[in-house]
Amino acid sequence: LGETAITLDVVAFITLACALAVYSLYASAVSLRDEAAAHTTLGPSVSGLVANGGLATASFAALGFFLTPWLMRLGGYPAATIALIAITVPMIATFLGLRCWVMTRLQGATGLGEFLAINYGMGVAAVAGLTLGAAAIVFLALVLLAAASLMSIVSSGAISNATCIAIAAVLLVLTGAPAGFRTAGQLTRLHTLLASIGAIGIVLMVVAQLGGWDETAAGLTRAARQLEWATTSGRGGGDYNLALAVAGSFGPGETWNGLTILSVQIAIACTLLLMVWLPWTIATTDVRQIGSQATIGASWGGFLMIAVTIILGMGTLWIDRSGVASAPVVPIPWRNIGDIDAALLMTAVTREYVWAEVVIGLGGAAALHAIALALLGGATAALRPLWLGRLQGKQAARRAVAGSQIAASAIVIGAVSLLFMPVDTLMSLNALALSLSPVAIVPVAAACWFPTLTRQGLIAGMIAGLTVATLEIFLPLISSIAVHAAAAGIATTVIVAVLVSRGRPHDTRQVTRIKANAAFRDIFAPGANDQSQGRYPRAILVALMWIFFASGPGMVIGNDLFGAPNLPRAQWDFPIPSIAVWQFLAWATGAALIWYLARGLGMTSVTRAQLDQINAYRNPPPAARQTGPNISDH
């Protein structure tokens, strides 16, 4: 090992990591046994998900740990604004979840890919599935790279990056390939506990490394030396440092800054919906878990994500690019653009605090393992029609399991192969994947709400949308308004799908979609005394307003509402900048709104009578034999 010294805390981390791996293998074996007994199609373990929001919390913790600061390349509060997808995703999932769950039950679909195949045929299902599968390979490569960097840091270099990648890949194949979401369900409590402890530990240790809460807050005023300045056109004095405010205003041409962040949120939110939330929603057997996951994931998981992102994002500002620390942080050489910014602070923290490797390592490993399992489960669910075909019954169940195992293994192998590319190339592929994958949300929404959009229209629209999104990445066409390529792809898909559907207004599966939508309306038609009928439009309006002010152009109001950041810190209403207060208020109100949607409006609940109606639609009772006129009643 050369000059690397293996200390007690490194040994403890390696030992506990091995224990986590062994337990993961055990959970995977149990999941596979349950899979074979139930003849299901890789659904999550409901018993492991009851009332604790583990899948959502662990997934968001992984984003808060690494992916948001890394992908966005932002320090400070702009990164925390992106982190509010921890609220946006559960909010949208609450609106979509019940209808999507019921529609799949009405039509007998057990996965996202099967749902699209039933409604639009193999063409739409194949385009959407292959797009999501390719994106999953890229995202999983980033997760493996993050895991390798984490393990290398916490082991003080005792384990090389290549070895870490190999270990993580083998563990994913052994745990994720056999049972996917079901394994995630078995591990959800452990993932949640370890990820939460790791997140809290990171926050406390980084703050201590920066000199305590007072020094951290006081150091915000010195952040001007680290990031460039931008204008907000007069709000609170005009020019704010990007570390302390979100650029943009309501002035001509400047609202696009807010729309840029909003469109980035839309891209990430749609990707998480398609690859994590909707596949899990469709696969779960208990519809009530939609509300539980959304509420707990947004409240606790959202809090962790925003807090960790702010601390890590602000902490990286204390280390300038020359490696000279401008606050009480151990000077660390600046790394290449492809490295995780947070790794700078993590290295400093692990050198300074005993047992930091154990806390950070296990928390990060649990969070990354959770989201990797979710990516594998979502991708295989989208790809399943490619190998399932028209099979039914036990034969279909066996092929579904075998095909999912092969597909998951192929995705992991593909992700590892991408790591041999230059980091800049990998980051370009990530930008492309984040732009293309959201296009698949259009056929899902069309099947649930707009059944008149035809198969031909959606195929043409998706091809056009994927083309425009790709061109927007490499040859920007609308860079003047700075909208993310995913938004351009979604808009193109919708426009082309509508135009082609008008020209060819019918397809062979349209009757199936119209009947299912009519059945949903009949089953969930409000009663005469139902007072919630008028609340749904108001709830949608409130949700749109929340998105506008919390994530869209309206967020610039928070720059100076509680004290302009270019004023002395003593004149602030709180010890932290105004935009930070605004973001935590956005988190609190967003979590409360999700709770109201899920509980107050019952958007994630189904009565026994409604379940009976759903089952009756899917499996209609045989027609009663009529009694002939010549048959006696005696």
Regions found by a protein language model. Name each.
Residues 2-66, 176-179, 198, 533, ...:
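Membrane-interface "cap" regions at the ends of multi-pass membrane proteins
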Residues 119-126, 136-137, 166, 380-423, ...:
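Loop-to-transmembrane helix boundary motifs in multi-pass membrane proteins
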Residues 21, 80-177, 262-270, 279, ...:
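Helix-loop-helix module between adjacent transmembrane segments
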Residues 31, 479-569, 588-634:
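Terminal cytosolic tails of multi-pass membrane transporters
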Residues 3-8, 69-82, 144-164, 182-192, ...:
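Transmembrane helix-loop boundary segments of multi-pass membrane transporters
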Residues 3-6, 43-46, 74, 78-82, ...:
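Loop-to-helix junctions at membrane interfaces in multi-pass transport proteins
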Residues 23-32, 136, 140-144, 148-163, ...:
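Hydrophobic alpha-helical segments and their helix-loop junctions in multi-pass secondary transporters
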Residues 108-117, 179-192, 273-307, 371-374, ...:
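Hydrophobic, small-residue-rich membrane helices and short re-entrant helix-turn-helix hairpins
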